[in-house]
């Protein structure tokens, strides 16, 4: 099965995608935990060379919210999602293909006045969604960085 999902299913997946992006940018880990599937496929090979075929939700939230990643209070992000193409791959699975721009800034201290690093990724992402107990949940991501501005590779380096 490979078809365009119904309007209702596509907008429900879009809502889950919005919650995912907003939770990252607002560092709202409780919000993140509510919009994700119990297990996720995380293909971060383009980001830091790692792939997880079936990462449990609590491990995913722990990784994302860690001080070495988005949990660093000195790092601000905006995960901007552009145009999307949706494909329904089964009754309870939808794949999204998105244009993406992800901006990152790292600040010198908690006053958030002096930017010490900038790094912005441009490209796309494939995302997966799974229907869980009647609700569409974010179930994974594979970013594709086509090009970067500034020092994206240094944002999460210690």
Swiss-Prot record:
Recorded metabolic or biological pathway in which this protein acts: Pigment biosynthesis
Keywords recorded for this protein, A-Z: Lyase
Keyword field contains Isomerase: no
Induction or repression: Expression correlates with the formation of the sclerotia and thus the pigment production and is directly regulated by the cluster-specific activator CPUR_05433.
Active site as annotated: 79, 104
Gene Ontology terms, MF aspect: scytalone dehydratase activity
Pfam families: Scytalone_dh
EC numbers for this chain: 4.2.1.-
Keyword Cell membrane: no
Function description: Scytalone dehydratase-like protein; part of the ergochrome gene cluster responsible for the typical purple-black color of the ergot sclerotia. The ergochrome gene cluster produces several ergot pigments including the yellow ergochrome secalonic acid and its derivatives, as well as the red anthraquinones endocrocin and clavorubin. The pathway begins with the synthesis of atrochrysone thioester by the polyketide synthase (PKS) CPUR_05437. The atrochrysone carboxyl ACP thioesterase CPUR_05436 then breaks the thioester bond and releases the atrochrysone carboxylic acid from CPUR_05437.
Entry similarity comment: Belongs to the scytalone dehydratase family.
Protein name: Scytalone dehydratase-like protein CPUR_05428
Native source organism of the sequence: Claviceps purpurea (strain 20.1) (Ergot fungus)
């Amino acid at each position: 099965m490979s078809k365009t999902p119904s309007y209702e299913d596509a907008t429900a997946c879009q809502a889950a995608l919005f919650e995912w992006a907003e939770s990252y940018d607002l560092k709202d880990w409780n919000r993140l935990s509510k919009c994700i599937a119990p297990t996720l496929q995380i293909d971060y090979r383009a980001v830091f060379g790692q792939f997880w075929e079936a990462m449990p939700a609590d491990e995913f939230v722990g990784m994302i919210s860690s001080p070495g990643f988005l949990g660093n209070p000195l790092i601000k992000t905006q995960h901007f999602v552009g145009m999307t193409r949706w494909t329904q791959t089964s009754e309870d699975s939808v794949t999204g293909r998105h244009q993406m721009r992800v901006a990152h800034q790292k600040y010198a201290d908690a006053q958030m006045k002096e930017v010490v690093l900038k790094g912005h990724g441009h490209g796309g992402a494939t995302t997966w969604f799974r229907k869980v107990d009647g609700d569409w949940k974010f179930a994974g991501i594979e970013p594709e960085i086509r090009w970067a501005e500034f020092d994206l590779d240094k944002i999460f380096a210690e």
